[in-house]
Amino acid sequence: MGRRNSYFPGNFVPLFFVFIVLILQQERVICQEDRSLDNPAANRLYNQFVFDKISNLTEVFEDDIKRELGFCITNVKEDYNEAFNFSTKPDFLNACGKTTKGDMMQRICTAAEVRIYFNGLLGGAKRATNYLKPNKNCNLSSWMSGCEPGWACRTAKDVKVDLKDDKNVPVRTQQCAPCCAGFFCPRGITCMIPCPLGAYCPEANLNRTTGLCDPYHYQLPSGQPNHTCGGADIWADIGSSSEVFCSAGSFCPSTIDKLPCTKGHYCRTGSTAELNCFKLATCNPRSTNQNITAYGIMLFAGLGFLLIILYNCSDQVLATRERRQAKSREKAVQSVRDSQSREKWKSAKDIAKKHATELQQSFSRTFSRRKSMKQPDLMRGLSQAKPGSDAALPPMLGSSSDTKKGKKKEKNKLTEMLHDIEQNPEDPEGFNLEIGDKNIKKHAPKGKALHTQSQMFRYAYGQIEKEKAMQEQNKNLTFSGVISMANDIDIRKRPMIEVAFKDLSITLKGKNKHLMRCVTGKLSPGRVSAVMGPSGAGKTTFLTALTGKAPGCIMTGMILVNGKVESIQSYKKIIGFVPQDDIVHGNLTVEENLWFSARCRLPADLPKPEKVLVVERVIESLGLQHVRDSLVGTVEKRGISGGQRKRVNVGLEMVMEPSLLILDEPTSGLDSSSSQLLLRALRREALEGVNICMVVHQPSYTLFRMFDDLILLAKGGLICYQGPVKKVEEYFSSLGIVVPERVNPPDYYIDILEGILKPSTSSGVTYKQLPVRWMLHNGYPVPMDMLKSIEGMASSASGENSAHGGSAHGSVVGDDGTSFAGEFWQDVKANVEIKKDNLQNNFSSSGDLSEREVPGVYQQYRYFLGRLGKQRLREARTLAVDYLILLLAGICLGTLAKVSDETFGAMGYTYTVIAVSLLCKITALRSFSLDKLHYWRESRAGMSSLAYFLAKDTVDHFNTIVKPLVYLSMFYFFNNPRSTVTDNYVVLICLVYCVTGIAYTLAILFEPGPAQLWSVLLPVVLTLIATSTNDNKIVDSISELCYTRWALEAFVVSNAQRYKGVWLITRCGSLMENGYNIKHFPRCLVFLTLTGILSRCAAFFCMVTFQKK
């Protein structure tokens, strides 16, 4: 319903026609003489007859009221009873009958006269100039005393009045007299209309000082000295007829009685009864409202106390849990070490006893030659064993029949041993896991057999110690040796991935620039390959091409996976990519970061003890034991060191046990020792068959020698060398490029490729010729342009631009004479192609060939929930500040924006919508703005975007429920509107849910700065549109789509429903002026909720569509 400037519609008459007729429709069947009215029995019969007529006629006009006034009348019978049910106090009817000497019914207005009155209100007539449309009784030629305000006349005795007649005005000119108390007589008609409940309509008294008829605002007509003050003259909205409303601080049980409010009670304007105050509220005599500020203060103190506890104790909860885990872990480690020490000591004693027995037997057998030759060998084996390693363990004496019999009696199940150790920690029996035992798989525990955390830690550390012992025995272990070791100690084998690339070229679309050209080689499993080259050589582009993505580029050539032309994306579940930036959650500990990645990316059917082993192995190999329980830290809150953070960044990919691991400059910013520690961990992964490729910048010689293969790139993405590190110096020496003594070879080669150093003239080669020499050396086909113009080769190719991880080098398109406009157009086309390819990559899908089943959406959703719960607890201080701001906003708005009865508190609710929308949007931006890089990395790794989004939204539902309560606890108790707390709370929940979804979309689409500006601008602008009073169809149409409009309507309607009786006209006028409907309260909540759902769908679509992979 659109807005209108007037308060009342043209068809407003039927409502009041019903109200009047329902009371006044009677047959003149009762004696109208004064003595009949003095009879109590007759009075009861008279009242009973009136109310029977009312109940019968209600159904007749119910359809008309619903059709014409449905926007402000919810239940016709209920609203009628609230306004005109005088059954409890009918005294004013009997009093009027006595005053009019029995002709009251001939003074009551018909439907036609009621129509004249309300049509006058429609025309804008107010109290000061209340001239109604001329009619049969009051016009320019006939103006009697009954036409004056507060007066009425009667019809002739022989005239039968039809109160239902809404077309003909009866002649009513006889015996004009003041209006009865409890009725009002408008100026311009000569009849009476009953005042509604909640009104106070006594007979007026002349105030000789002001000349007004108190308590009303009309004056006596001039030139009529015998005219006196009558009754009430108007009933309209409170702004036009406030004098007939029962005043605040008093209550009116009937329209002729007004009583002051007693102590302990309060009475609002238009009250028919006094209301009890709450226990802690202060209500003095004549209180207009109860002072419930004490409840607000108590609630404020309670919430403040809880927030302080949350503020100070949130970290302690997680810290206590971490300490308990650390104790369990340390206990497991110590138990494993003690068990191994006991086993070694027991083995040594058994060997000593056996040798002593054999020595004694040798003496008794006169030094048998065979015994004398066997003893030194056994003693030598004992003396050579190291006390700190498993080398001291005895060999398995499988040939001994006694040993075979003993094995059958022994308990070899690790689970039983673990239970024994837990129950009997001092028992000398411990882990009986001997290195070299070929049957160790039979003794190893199954994942389902280990239940407690202590058991899993002991199992993990036992395996790690065995692996350390095996590596100590085989320091120069090869890949084939690892396979053999894996068979011995049950290391799970990983699928192998070999990546071969042949004549690979990458050209930037729109500009035709070569980012890489004629790249041929391969990456083998079990080897660590280093990619080196000067800045702009295309190192990051090369890594991007390996992952099967080159947005905005044309990629030619072949990439073979295990000798087949397949998409590398089909293996993304077993491919790890470590970005150059350390994208790690700063508000999680080192262990929590690693565990989350392991849970989401390891096989779903992998037992938890095996996952514990994987995580503990990575922590051990990366040297992160001492900081495992430390927060990684952020820019604002310092955590672990930069080198440790870099290792955690690598560990996120190692814990998923990849088959292909790609790292972009993992050693940048690390010192030599940290780099060696990281590379040793990577070499251990390579020994398990992992194909590792990493970009490095000028490594030290020690680090350089730890690589297996080297890929050396020149500017323009051309290969100068690809092969074993051990043969790189030999190859360049064959070209006449010899590394001087005491010079690091990689530094020397990169300086030559950069052009800083020039090869000796005797070599007869320049740095621009090195890529061609490599092609010729290996017999690769060389493009004709490179053969003909070696000098211009470098300038014809470009390096990486900013979109590919580097800066552009080489020639620029504008150098060949292209105009500025042409160059600009090429840049635009290139950017469009990049965006287009990104969108295609986001929605493209390839088959899964990794043969790894990771946890599903629901399981990942649970993992995300757990992670977000920890993050929210650690961000409790930020959350406490948000709540305190909401509390202050509620206090300020509740104090300053008092509820206005004329507008049903619309102004205060307008401020509420703006404040709550703004504050909740800004805080909701943090859900996605701060984690964009983390989401992009996790999504690229194959984690579920739906699980991520739903978990974020689920955790934010805590704020959706609590924040309205925090704000309302202050606003409601300081403002105290008539609507219930429940209604306001439900509206605020729907509002917060709606604006949170909008904030998600803004956070995903924009950077944090612009997103905050939009969050501030939208609530203000949309609220202005929703409250605009201009008769503009376009604005009205836009307003219908604004969430602020539905929130305001819900607030106002919930409040307007509490205004009944004398407030009926005010309610209908205010709702019509704003275009609200009293029945739209559920509809408003549905629209707010639907807006929140649709905005979340839009946010999820934008998150998936515009992510950067």
From Swiss-Prot:
Entry's Gene Ontology molecular function annotations: ABC-type transporter activity; ATP binding; ATP hydrolysis activity
Pfam families to which the protein is assigned, alphabetical: ABC2_membrane_7, ABC_tran
Keyword Transport included in the entry's annotation: yes
Lineage top rank: taxon: Eukaryota
CDD domains: ABCG_EPDR
InterPro entries: AAA+_ATPase (IPR003593), ABC_transporter-like_ATP-bd (IPR003439), ABC_transporter-like_CS (IPR017871), ABCG_dom (IPR043926), ABCG_transporters (IPR050352), P-loop_NTPase (IPR027417)
Domain ABC transporter, residue spans: 499-741
Signal peptide boundaries: none
Membrane topology of the entry: Multi-pass membrane protein
GO BP, sorted A to Z: pollen tube growth; polyamine transport
Protein name, per record: ABC transporter G family member 28
Lineage: Eukaryota, Viridiplantae, Streptophyta, Embryophyta, Tracheophyta
